[in-house]
Regions:
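Extended glycan-interaction surfaces of carbohydrate-active proteins
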Residues: 1-66, 93-145
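Solenoid-repeat scaffolds in large eukaryotic assemblies
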Residues: 19, 86-87
Length: 145
């Protein structure tokens, strides 16, 4: 699961090598799922009708949906631990979809379909913080992004 691992990184429990391994697994999950970013909540998703209601289908909401709110926090951890190139590459799909959809949606389904509120402050906040962190890194390196 993505969220507990990210929390372990935030808590300082993973080595740099372990963070790299986790990130590679997240990218592989994105590739296998066909979802747009590392905001993927889980992979593989629970099968069709495992749950009733809003999560009855795979890649919907918390059943494998793609949340910038989650992925953006992983981006922050990548930056904090020196994985700048990875963070820059992995934030792009999140920024691109905000621009394309003209909003900060809660989550995205298969095919990058935006869902939930288009004004989700959690998404806006984590992206803004990650962008600020990238700019701070660039300034410290006397570089531009």
């Amino acid at each position: 699961k993505v969220r507990p691992i990210r929390t372990c990184i935030e808590a300082g429990l993973l080595t740099r090598e372990e963070i790299a391994t986790v990130n590679q697994q997240m990218l592989e999950n994105v590739r296998l799922s066909g979802m747009p970013s590392i905001g993927l909540t889980l992979y593989p998703p629970y099968p069709e009708n495992f749950f009733t209601g809003g999560m009855a289908h795979p890649y919907v909401y918390q059943n494998g949906g793609d949340w910038t709110w989650f992925g953006g926090r992983m981006i922050q951890q990548l930056i904090a631990h020196g994985f700048i190139e990875e963070a820059y590459a992995e934030i792009r799909p999140m920024i691109d979809r905000v621009i394309q959809n003209k909003g900060f949606y809660e989550w995205y389904g298969k095919g990058g379909v935006p869902s939930g509120s288009g004004h989700f402050k959690g998404s806006a906040g984590v992206l803004a913080k990650a962008i600020e962190m990238l700019h701070k890194w660039a300034k410290e390196q006397n570089r531009s992004l």
